[in-house]
Amino acid sequence: MDLEQKTRGLSKSCALLIVIAGMERYAFKGVASNLVTYLTDVVKMSNSRAAKTVNTWAGFTSMLPLFSAPLADTYWDRFFTILASSSVYFVGLVGLTWTAFAGSRSATKTISSYFLYSSLCLVSIGLGVLNPSLQAFGADQLDHDLDKNFDLSSGDQKDAKATRKTQFFQLWYFGVCTGSLMGVTVMAYIQDTFGWVLGFAIPGIVIFLSILVFMSGCGIYVYAPGARLKKKTTTTPFEKILKFIKGRVVKQRSIYTLADEKDLDAMELELEERPLCKCETEDIETPSTTSKGLEDDESSKTVFSGIDNVKLVIRLFPIWMMLLMFAVIFQLPATFFTKQGVTMKRNIGSNFKIPPATLQSTITLSIILLMPLYDKILIPITKRIKKNGTGISVMERMGVGMFLSIIAIVIAAIVERKRLAISQKMKTLPDYDPETVPLSIFWLLPQYILLGISDIFTVVGMQEFFYSEVPVRMRTMGFALYTSVFGVGSFVSAALISIVEAYSSSTGDRQNWFADDMSEARLDKYYWLLALTSTISFVVYIFLCKFFKSSSDQGDEKEEAPK
C-alpha cells in the first residue's frame, strides 16, 4: 500500500465522532449565534450588557476545559465522560427551552432570568467537559489507525503521519463548520419566525440524538486504558506535575523551618556525607539503604518528569497569549456584527427579511467551500516552494490567519463608518426611520468572508499545534489549551467593552461607543482599537516564532498512544 492510499481516508470511528461533533456544533450555534438578540429583544438588556453577557458566557464555556481536561486525562474514562457531559448539556438546553416558554407566558422576568442563567451554566458545564473529551477520544481512534496502518521507512512514515493528522483535523473542522452552518442559518430563521421556544427546543433534540448516535458506535471505538488502570500501573503527566509542584513547595517550606527555641543553643552543623565518586557507589546496595534508595530514585524520576511536563506546557503560553486578540475579534460576529445587521436593509423582495444572525453562516460557508482549495492548491504549491513533505508549517498557518483577521476588522471599521455617515444624513430627512439605514446588509459580507478564511488557517492550526506540542497522555489538556484561547479571549472582549464604555461615557460630551441607539454608537472606533491591538499581537507572534522550537524538533520522547 503506497503513501497516497494510506492517507486517503479515516476509520469508521473517526468519521462517526466527526458527525457527532457536527451535531454538537449545530446545537451550540443554534443557541449562541442569536443569543444577543434574545437578550436585547426579549430580556430587554442594553447592547453593551447583552454583548458582555454573551462574551462572559462564551468565555466561561471555553475556559472550563482547562479544569475538566486534567481530570479527564487523570481520573475519568473518556467514553463515560462524553456520555455524562452530553447529558448535562441536554438538561441545560431543556432548561433553556422551559425558560423561553415560561417567559412568554409571564409578565415578570425574575424567575425567567434566574432559570436563564442557570440553564446557560448547565450548557457551559456540559459543553466545557464534552468538547475536549470528544476531540481526545477522536485522537485515540486516529492514533490506533496510524499505528495499525503505517509501516514505512522513518522519513516517509513521519510525513505520512503528519498528512493523516492534518487530514483528521481538517475533516473534524469541516464537520464542525457544517454543523455550525446549519445551526446558524436554520435556527436563526426558526427563532425569528416561529419564536424562541421552538428555537431552543430543536438544539436540545439534536443533542439527545447525538447521544444515541454516540452509543451506537460502542462496538467500533478504540478505548484508552480506564482511569483506574492508569492510576495503578503508571503515573499520569498531570499527576507528575502536581507531585513536582508539591515537592517544590515542601522543599521551600523546609528550608525556612527553624528548630524549636529550646534547641537553638544546642544546634550543631553537620556536613552531609557524599561519596567522592558517584559512579562507584551507584551499584552498591546495603540493607539499610536499598529501600530508601529506590524511593529516592522514584521521587527523582517523578521530579524530573514533572519538570519536563511543566516545561512542555509553559513554553506554549507566549504563543497562547498572542492568539488572544484573534479570539477577541471572533466574538464580534455573534455580538456587534449582528446588532449592526439589525439596523441595515435586510429585505429580499417584499415578504422576506434576512435574519441578521444568518450572516454568520457566511463564515462557515466560506470555510466549507475554500478548505478543499487549501488542500488541493495551496498545500501542493507550498510543498514545491519549500521542498518538504508538509508544505506550510503550523506556525505559518496560524500567522496567516491572524493577518487576515486584522484585514477583516479594518474592513469592518470602514463599513461601519459608512453606515454611520448615511445614518447622519438620513436624520435631516422628514421620512427618517431611526431603526433602518438604507444600506444593504450585504456590505457586511467581506468582513464575514475574511474571518472565515482566517478561520481555515488559524483555528485548524491551533488545534494541530496544541495537539502536537503536549505529551500524548495530556492530549485532552492540549485541546483545552486551544479552547481556552477563545475562553480567555471572550473575557478579554468583555473587559475591553467595560473599559471602553466607562472611558467613552465618563466625562464631557463624549458619546458612549456602545450606545443603544446604533446611529449614535461609535463601533468604528472600537474596531480600529481592535485592529491596533491585533497588529501588535501579530508582530510579537512573528518574533516569538523565530525562537520557538517544536517538541518534535527537539527530539523529546513521546509516550506511546493507547492501542
UniProtKB/Swiss-Prot annotation:
Topological category with respect to the lipid bilayer: Multi-pass membrane protein
PTM annotation (Phosphothreonine): residues: 81
Keyword Signal applies: no
Transmembrane segments: 56-76, 82-102, 110-130, 168-188, 194-214, 317-337, 362-382, 394-414, 441-461, 479-499, 528-548
A single GO cellular-component term on record: membrane
Tissue: Expressed in roots and flowers.
Cross-referenced InterPro entries: MFS_trans_sf, POT_fam
GO MF terms, alphabetically ordered: transmembrane transporter activity
Keywords: Membrane, Phosphoprotein, Transmembrane, Transmembrane helix, Transport
Subcellular location: Membrane
Principal localisation: membrane
Keyword Plastid among record annotations: no
Protein family membership: Belongs to the major facilitator superfamily. Proton-dependent oligopeptide transporter (POT/PTR) (TC 2.A.17) family.
Protein name: Protein NRT1/ PTR FAMILY 5.9
Organism: Arabidopsis thaliana (Mouse-ear cress)
Gene, per the UniProt record: NPF5.9
